[in-house]
Amino acid sequence: MTDTIDPDLIERGRKMFAGDWHFIWASPSIETLPPMGSVEIAFAGRSNVGKSSLINALTGRNALARTSHTPGRTQELIFFEGPPNAGLRLVDMPGYGYAAASKAKVASWTSLIHHFLQGRATLARVYVLIDGRHGLKDVDLDILKTLDKAAVSYQIVLTKADQVKAAELAERVTATVAALAKHPAAFPEVLTTSSRTGAGMPELRAAMIRLLDERR
């Protein structure tokens, strides 16, 4: 709810994401990562959890990040950059947990993600997207352990909130917060969003503004 957040953060977030956001880089391997510069915020999640849709909703651009009905299609780290004065990049990470992917492909994705997480000094936070209809799964808990080990700050975002009854969503948030108590790198607040309705986007933008302020 936006009435619990500093209105200045909400407005600054709105302005920043109303600016020019564009694709700048795709990295299929650790050797092809772009030079470090701006603060980076990454989005991780199971295949088809809605990472690309969320990035599009954040920036108000329907086709900035490619969406796909084919799980596991995103096989690279995709970098987007905002207006010059924003000092921020968004990173769309490969989806995980797609059972039909080959073992070699899964190993390749896993290596790329692990090396990126452990060696990126400009990475301020990873938003781990969880399908709000289903909550945390074992494969999600595995990536949380990876983030804990890498000592990378992360926060859970429940997606597709418009497809869940309010009472059920509240229970899911409570259960997720309880689960995060076991994870030292986790930010203890859970966000809920809907890329279709735009719910939760002002709060997510404001959270990113707060992160940028902390980095300056």
Swiss-Prot record:
SUPFAM superfamilies under this entry? P-loop containing nucleoside triphosphate hydrolases
Instruction: Please give the cofactor(s) recorded in the UniProt entry for this protein.
Output: Mg(2+)
Q: Taking every annotated instance into account, which residue ranges of this chain make up the domain EngB-type G?
A: 37-214
Q: Name one GO cellular component term.
A: cytosol
- Residues binding Mg(2+) are 52, 74
Q: Name one GO biological process term.
A: division septum assembly
For this UniProt record, give its keywords in alphabetical order, as a comma-separated list: Cell cycle, Cell division, GTP-binding, Magnesium, Metal-binding, Nucleotide-binding, Septation
InterPro entries tied to this protein: G_ENGB_dom (IPR030393), GTP-bd (IPR006073), GTP-bd_ribosome_bio_YsxC (IPR019987), P-loop_NTPase (IPR027417)
Q: Which GO terms describe its molecular function?
A: GTP binding; metal ion binding
Which residues does the record give as GTP binding sites? 45-52, 72-76, 92-95, 159-162, 193-195
Which family does the record claim for this protein?
A: Belongs to the TRAFAC class TrmE-Era-EngA-EngB-Septin-like GTPase superfamily. EngB GTPase family.
User: Mind telling me which PANTHER family this protein's record contains?
Assistant: ENGB-TYPE G DOMAIN-CONTAINING PROTEIN, MSS1/TRME-RELATED GTP-BINDING PROTEIN
Q: What does this protein do?
A: Necessary for normal cell division and for the maintenance of normal septation.
What protein name does the entry list? Probable GTP-binding protein EngB
Source organism per entry reads: Rhodopseudomonas palustris (strain TIE-1)
- Gene designation per UniProt: engB
